[in-house]
Amino acid sequence: MAAMRAHARRRHPHALMSRAAGLPRLSWFAGLTWFAGGSTGAGCAAHPALAGLTAGARCPAYAAISASTARPAATALPAVAASTARPAATAGTTPATGASGSARPTDAAGMADLARPGVVATHAVRTLGTTGSRAIGLCPSQPLDCPRSPQATLNLGSMGRSLDGPQWRRARVRLCGRWWRRSNTTRGASPRPPSTCRGDNVSMIELEVHQADVTKLELDAITNAANTRLRHAGGVAAAIARAGGPELQRESTEKAPIGLGEAVETTAGDMPARYVIHAATMELGGPTSGEIITAATAATLRKADELGCRSLALVAFGTGVGGFPLDDAARLMVGAVRRHRPGSLQRVVFAVHGDAAERAFSAAIQAGEDTARR
């Protein structure tokens, strides 16, 4: 065993996880190593600190995958599998699947091997592309759930964007000391496409501007520019309270007061939306500021994700009773949406009144797109 460890250190130094990368020290066989040149190697060991990506076992509560940055990226690398009781798999083969790619049952001896700590897993783990980084680890508090999966696919094509199996739930992936959050997806579903405007780790939010009555929009949630006491007495707030009925104001009173820049939800009452998210943009009758508008927008987006909303209508915060300049409010709100890393949220509609408001928000969206392209 000592000789094998020494050989691994000489041959595959990148398989060792260092504390400098923010990961705990693991044994040499805890990592999955791969080669772009078509050769095979040992990989994916069932270490006591890890649960192997194998049939009959849950996906790891903490999996470490190391990849060499010196190798060129590949669209589909050969399967890597090895066992202390079986010869290593030939490059391009997949021991856990048949010729058609369908799952093949595992024999009892193989299952017994997988249950023993320290024995190299017999099932293939395929890597697609490269992360351009040394290591990736799964947060131990959010394990993936892949019961009885004969083959798991680690898609490392875009900085650890996805780690998929037949069944999985939300997970967080640690990459080079930073947290990247997976989209909130139902079991068995495929992740949504990555964003092209704010980074590969988040999903795209469609931005729209409409001159519309926010109380008539059939979306998951609409927003209300409220005061900290949630008394909906004037402007858009009064229109929302009238359209929602007495239940909306009753719920608001129960949840009041809230702090400036905070957001709470109530039911939408008689309106077609499911929720109303009330964001406190000012004190009762008082002015607002750019910092409050930015904080209120961010809090509204987070609340929409917490509620599992896919679509959200935003009104122009602070531009009515608050007296904040329309162009500045549009720029701040669009910027907050672009910085937001969504969970369930896919569509944001800016519901505005008048041509001036429509031009302001449309210009803010266009300016953000021009900046992203540069």
From Swiss-Prot:
**Which domain of life does the UniProt lineage start with?**
Bacteria
Which residues belong to any copy of the Macro domain? 179-354
InterPro entries found in the cross-reference section: Macro_dom, Macro_dom-like
Where are the residues of the annotated region Disordered? 86-109
**SMART domains, per this entry?**
A1pp
* Stretches with biased composition (Low complexity): 86-104
Q: Which PANTHER family match?
A: GANGLIOSIDE INDUCED DIFFERENTIATION ASSOCIATED PROTEIN 2-RELATED, MACRO DOMAIN-CONTAINING PROTEIN
| Name of this chain's protein | Uncharacterized protein MT1950
Which organism does this sequence originate in?
A: Mycobacterium tuberculosis (strain CDC 1551 / Oshkosh)
